[in-house]
Structure formats: structure tokens, C-alpha cells
Amino acid sequence: LYTKETLTNSNFLEKKTILNVWASWCLECEREHSYLIQLSKNKDIDMIGINYKDESSEAMGWLSMRGNPYRIIIKDSIGDLSLDLGVYGVPETYILDKNQVIQYKHIGPINNQIIQEEMLPILSE
């Protein structure tokens, strides 16, 4: 989002990754954002955002006001990457293993119950 760098396997850390698809115009994304901020404090987890069909200036302003939980933000202006992932709408959250294989997918906003009951057991494996 901030640079035009191409993402490669070398950009992924050797740890589990939360991949979150979001947009500044998405009200449900705002509802889940504080939970993503909390998850980003866990140093055993990497967090990557996919900014979906959004204007860069709007997305950067949104993160500036609310905090940026992502180590990397991928701009998906027309939704091609998200379509390849099978995204139905935003927000959607994935957990990738250390080899970038999808282990978990959640459609809709995450909350504390989803984190505790569904995500943390996978993240702690």
C-alpha cells in the first residue's frame, strides 16, 4: 500500500500468518479492527493485510486514525487477488501456516469469541 514492492515468498516470516482482507469503506472491518490490533501484539504471529477495492489515500488515512496492525499491506485495487483466495466480501480472515498454506478461513468480522474458540487453537499448534 505504501510502496510498489512485489510480494514474494521471502516477504513471509517463518511463523504463522494472519491474512486479513479489509477496506476503509467497510463498516464490519471497523468493528473487528481493535481485535486485529490486539492480535498484532503477539510476536509469534505475523499479520498481513489485503486492502480490497479501496483508494490508497482512504486506506492510509483510515489506518492512520485507527492504528496499523499489519506488517505488510497488499493493495488489491480490482479484487483479483481476493478473487483467487475465494473472498466473498470484506472482512475475511485467514490463518496461514509457516509454508503459507491456508489452515483457516473466517468470513465476516472477527471478535473475541472467534479468536478464543477458533483462531488461537490453530495459532498455538
Report the location of each language-model feature.
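Short pre-active-site segment immediately N-terminal to redox-active cysteine/selenocysteine motifs
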Residues: 15-17, 22-25, 89
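Hydrophobic beta-strand anchors of alpha/beta hydrolase catalytic cores
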Residues: 18-19, 47, 93
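Structural microenvironment flanking redox-active thiols in thiol-disulfide oxidoreductases
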Residues: 30-67, 77-83
